[in-house]
C-alpha cells in the first residue's frame, strides 16, 4: 500500500487522510460519494483530514463545506490543475477553470485549520504547497505500462517500485562529483522545446530514447543537474524523482516556492537565466549547504495534517 511508502508519493498522501476516495481517479470531478457519506455518517471529529481531488473543489465548496461543524485539515491534489485558475475535469471532456472564489471561500471557513494543496499558486497564510511526489500508482494500476521494465521482470507494486529507487540511491554519488551538465530526457517534448531552446546547448545532455523508468533513473544519477519543466501542472513527478536521486532539478518558479525551501533545487524565473556561471555558482554554494532531505519523505508531509493544531 502506498501509505506505507518511505518517499512522498501522490496516492500515499491521499490514503493517509482520514477521509478519502476508496477508488480515486485522477482529475475526476465526480468522485464525491465518499464526501456525501462522510456528511451523512456519524464519524467526523475535530482535526480530521479530508482529501479531495482538486477537480472536486467546486462541489466541496458548494455542497460539503457549509455542513462541516468540526475542525479539519483539507488536502487536495491528484490532478494537474493549479490552485486556483487551473483547468479542471481536463481529461473527461468538460474543461473549465477553477475559480479563485471557490478557494477563498474555503480559506475563510472558521473550522479550516490548514489546507495543503498540490500545484498551489495561491498565497495565503492558511494554504501551503504540497508535493505530488513519486508516481507509484500508474505502474501499480497498469503493470503493462511501458514505464515498467518488463524485460527485467520488475514487480509493479508500490513497495517494489520504491525498492528499485532505494537500490539506485545506494549506488549514487554526491551531485558535486557528477558530470556537471544538465540531463534532459524527453521523448515527446514539443510543448517544452521552447523552454529547452533557451538553455545554451553546450550545457545539456539529451537522451530522447523511449525507455523504462528504471533506466531513466539510472541515467539521472550520472549528472549534477536536470531539466525539469512543468508537467501538465507546475509540479511534476520528475521534480521529486530527481531530488530522491540526488540530482539538482532546474525548475521555473511557481507560487511562493516554499515547498522547495531547504532542498537542492535551482529555481529560475526563465530558462534563459541558465548559464555556465549559474551552474558553477550553484554547485559551489550547494556543496556546503545543509539541506532538509526529510521533505522527500512521506512522513514529513503526513505529520503536518495528522497532528492536532498548535495552541
Regions from the language model: what does each represent?
Residues 1-267, 272-311:
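Nucleotide-sugar donor-binding catalytic core of glycosyltransferases
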